Amino acid sequence: MKQSVIGKLEGLLERNEEVLAMLGDATVISDQERFRALSKEYSQLEDVVKSFKAFQQAQLDLASAKEMLQEDDAEMREMAQEEMKAAKKVIEQLEDELQILLLPKDPNDDTNAFLEIRAGAGGDEAAIFAGDLFRMYSRFCEANKWQVEVMNVNEADLGGFKEIIVKVSGEGVYGKLKYESGGHRVQRVPETESQGRVHTSACTVVVLHEVPEAEAISINPADLKVDTFRASGAGGQHVNKTDSAIRITHIPSGIIVECQDQRSQHKNRAQAMSVLAARIQAIEDEKRRSAEETTRRSLVASGDRSERIRTYNYPQGRVSDHRINLTLYRLNEIMEGDLNALLEPIMLEHQADLLAALADE
């Protein structure tokens, strides 16, 4: 392992001890916000510190075994050879583990996310597929014990959605769902197709991380145009009697957000502002990424949200992810929410990219 990496690990070990000492300080304990922040930092350091301590112990074991090789006793030398072999194997495994633990982490991976699904080319069939995608993501969220809250929905006449926006809350939501941003294409025979011809339709999926209130970018109220209107869709007679739905236009960027799922205008406004902040932050994040990543490709579809990332071919029961040339003949399971079969290889590929970039530094 490079000495620069060892130095970084030693610094993290030292920081871990500092944080542990501070967590036992009465002044820190009385300051809830600081105590919470330090507890989070300690938790984040835990895995890398544990692995580095094991690495240091394995290095000591190797040195001890090398000393034993100088013994006159043949049996002791044989034992030393076995111990050296075992220590080297542990060191090799821990080096790989520590390299991964040191990879730069997306600070937004642990945040909640806004999932937006929009029907694209394909008319009614695209809207029906948007409904299928929403069902797929709902099942995936359910399996992960994540909460799904509908923010805004525009239903299509023949089923499915022209657009649906939901907030997904839970542990590590954005870290997994962010890989879903991009164009999703479906190839299948629509129920309305009498000739049995395969049609191609498309939907766009956008995943934005929620911006915590404390970190929310400042939005000038003067830059906002707020309209109220009567909500449409399900909800009984109430939706036809009050102007509870909200449409907010951010004039400088042209971003428009609508929320009408809540019965209260106040709640709809709060949700709309939340989505607006996430979209504006996404633009800022993309500007920063573009500046930082001039050469390294990113697996997370970012600026070009129309970029096709996946094709769902129903006649062949096939799902293809075009970013990593992965094809799986498990369409039924995937549409039932088994997204890990797709996400895990993508995340490993992304990890490999980061490791390659780290090696070049």
From Swiss-Prot:
Positions of modified residues (N5-methylglutamine): 237
Record keyword Protein biosynthesis present: yes
Pfam families named among the record's database cross-references: PCRF, RF-1
Keywords on record: Cytoplasm, Methylation, Protein biosynthesis
Protein's UniProt keywords contain Transmembrane helix: no
PROSITE patterns per record: RF_PROK_I
Top-level taxon: Bacteria
Coiled-coil regions, chain positions: none
The protein, known as: Peptide chain release factor 1
Species the sequence originates in: Shewanella denitrificans (strain OS217 / ATCC BAA-1090 / DSM 15013)
